């Protein structure tokens, strides 16, 4: 049975003359339709994820495609049980994806070769190919292409510097890169080309498109794909499911992300329900004892209950150390 809601993922690098005016009009349009989601608008284009009913999302796509600027924009469509967002945000930003380069990249002028999923699948297996994940470390940790390089970065803007520091591993290699939907790779692969790397290609449509492709069926992907909405993750490999995520506290296989309950920390952690309970969804003793701890507030824990949990953790830590 077809689900009543859908999630749309899309982007388009195209000049938008007055992005602030566009932002205001677009927000009003989304509210009128009843869509929820997060949309970024800049002078270089649009990048968004929205959720709504089948009717609402159809109307949105139809209206967008009627605008010559977005006539050929590709929408990746996921069925959903309900909304994937709580609110609607349309924000004006300087860049669609933040790289802060001195010499900016226009993907309409310079970008890596686009590979369809079947081509990407084949080239990934070439021994002279290096596959670079263009996402953040916490996205990689939940799932990635088998054998892909994990840049040690917490934000996309850190990627060029990481590449500069690890240039040796790329010398003489064919470079493949990928991200969730393709918007980051358009710029990143273009930056690689401008740096003088000659054989640079990107996964057209990103991981989301790869997972839906009827030919490759998500093969050679391990784990889940992190997404920036209420779903947190979506499956990719339809042939086999290999769990690569590891619980923050015990290292056991796990694919469940939570945020540290200390709001000033908010660290993303892969964590089982049992360990969320045991450690009060907090990454450290400092976060567990923080007076603003959200887990304590959500569960209306008394001081005695908190101290009992802390004592249990301390007892186990001592036992493990002996």
From Swiss-Prot:
Record flagged with keyword Oxidoreductase: yes
Keywords: Oxidoreductase, tRNA processing
Ranges where the Rhodanese domain occurs: 125-219
One Gene Ontology molecular-function label: oxidoreductase activity, acting on paired donors, with incorporation or reduction of molecular oxygen
SMART domains xref list: RHOD (SM00450)
The EC number(s) this enzyme carries: 1.14.-.-
Active site, renumbered: 179
Pfam families: Rhodanese, Rhodanese_C, UPF0176_N
Primary role: Catalyzes oxygen-dependent 5-hydroxyuridine (ho5U) modification at position 34 in tRNAs.
NCBIfam families cross-referenced by the UniProt entry: PRK00142.1-3
Family of this protein: Belongs to the TrhO family.
HAMAP family: TrhO (MF_00469)
Name of protein: tRNA uridine(34) hydroxylase
UniProt organism field: Bacillus subtilis (strain 168)
């Amino acid at each position: 049975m077809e689900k009543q809601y859908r999630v749309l993922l899309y982007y388009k690098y195209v000049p938008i003359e007055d992005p602030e005016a566009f932002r205001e009009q677009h927000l009003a349009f989304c509210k009128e339709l009843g869509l929820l989601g997060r949309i970024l608008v800049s002078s270089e284009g649009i990048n968004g994820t929205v959720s709504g009913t089948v009717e609402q999302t159809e109307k949105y796509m139809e209206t967008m495609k009627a605008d010559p600027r977005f006539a050929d924009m590709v929408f990746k469509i996921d069925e959903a049980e309900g909304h994937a967002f709580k609110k609607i945000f349309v924000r004006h930003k300087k860049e669609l994806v933040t790289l802060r380069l001195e010499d900016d990249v226009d993907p309409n002028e310079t970008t890596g070769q686009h590979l369809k999923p079947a081509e990407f699948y084949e080239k990934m297996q070439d021994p002279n190919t290096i596959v670079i994940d263009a996402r953040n470390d916490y996205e990689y940790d939940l799932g990635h292409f088998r054998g892909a390089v994990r840049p040690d970065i917490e934000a996309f803007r850190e990627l060029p510097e990481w590449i500069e520091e690890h240039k040796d591993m790329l010398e003489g290699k064919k470079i493949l890169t990928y991200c969730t939907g393709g918007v980051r790779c358009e710029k990143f692969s273009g930056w690689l080309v401008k740096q003088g790397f000659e054989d640079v290609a990107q996964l057209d449509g990103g991981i989301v498109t790869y997972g839906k492709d009827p030919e490759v069926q998500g093969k050679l992907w391990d784990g889940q794909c992190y997404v920036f909405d209420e779903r947190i993750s979506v499956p990719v490999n339809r042939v086999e499911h290999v769990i690569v995520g590891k619980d923050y506290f015990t290292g056991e296989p796990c694919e469940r992300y939570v945020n540290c309950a200390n709001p000033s920390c908010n660290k993303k952690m892969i964590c089982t329900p049992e360990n969320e309970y045991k450690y009060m969804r907090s990454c450290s003793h400092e976060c567990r004892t923080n007076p603003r701890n959200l887990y304590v507030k959500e569960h209306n824990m008394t001081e005695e209950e908190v101290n009992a949990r802390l004592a249990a953790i301390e007892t186990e830590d001592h036992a493990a150390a002996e």
